Amino acid sequence: MSAERLVYVMGPSGAGKDSLLAYARKHVREPRIAFAHRYITRKSDGHENHVELTRDEFAARAQLGFFALEWSSHGFRYGVGVEIDAWLAAGSVVVVSGSRAHLPAALERYPQMCVVHIDAAPHVLAERLATRGRETADEIRARLARSVRWAVPDGIALTAIDNSGTLDDAGRVLVALLEGLARS
């Protein structure tokens, strides 16, 4: 398995991670790049690549070992299926949408993975979160406070993408990174 071909994309809420991943899915030309969907115990809003599961369904799949990666965040459960291991073994570059808090556990399973941090200026994050309409003003402030406290673990090579500007600008950076990994 080529764990260095696993691309773990993470970032604070409102950074535009899902928009960038959708942009990359649309614009990559390399067929060996695969985008993993997540399994999440919340309703799909149509803006991210995920399969909605009930808490019981999620727990059953976790117990059966169906997840390569799993974590809890904001009262929900998130998982990435073990199918990514087969995709990696077949030589694909596999892109997953992860969590900053879960990064240490993900690195235990995939120590050579490529870590990508998507971020945006604080005022951009606040504006996007308010527009999204999922949280109250207090919840948005709490999310922004968490993003300030996050730090890169020691020894981790990190690719940072600033998504404060246009989606095309940040999207081209992500697409170039993925296509470069696929060619290597």
Curated annotation (Swiss-Prot):
Domain of life, per lineage = Bacteria
Q: Which reaction does it catalyse?
A: alpha-D-ribose 1,5-bisphosphate + ATP = 5-phospho-alpha-D-ribose 1-diphosphate + ADP
Name the enzyme's class.
transferase
**Keyword annotations from UniProtKB, A to Z:** ATP-binding, Nucleotide-binding, Transferase
Q: Which GO terms describe its biological process?
A: 5-phosphoribose 1-diphosphate biosynthetic process; organic phosphonate metabolic process
Task: Provide the gene name from the record.
Answer: phnN
Briefly, what is this protein's role?
A: Catalyzes the phosphorylation of ribose 1,5-bisphosphate to 5-phospho-D-ribosyl alpha-1-diphosphate (PRPP).
The record's comment on protein family reads:
Belongs to the ribose 1,5-bisphosphokinase family.
Name by which UniProt lists this protein: Ribose 1,5-bisphosphate phosphokinase PhnN
Enumerate the InterPro entries for this protein: GK/Ca_channel_bsu, P-loop_NTPase, PhnN
The record's EC number reads 2.7.4.23
Instruction: Please indicate if the UniProt record lists Nucleotide-binding as a keyword.
Output: yes
Q: In which pathway does it act?
A: Metabolic intermediate biosynthesis; 5-phospho-alpha-D-ribose 1-diphosphate biosynthesis; 5-phospho-alpha-D-ribose 1-diphosphate from D-ribose 5-phosphate (route II): step 3/3
| UniProt keyword Nucleus, yes or no | no
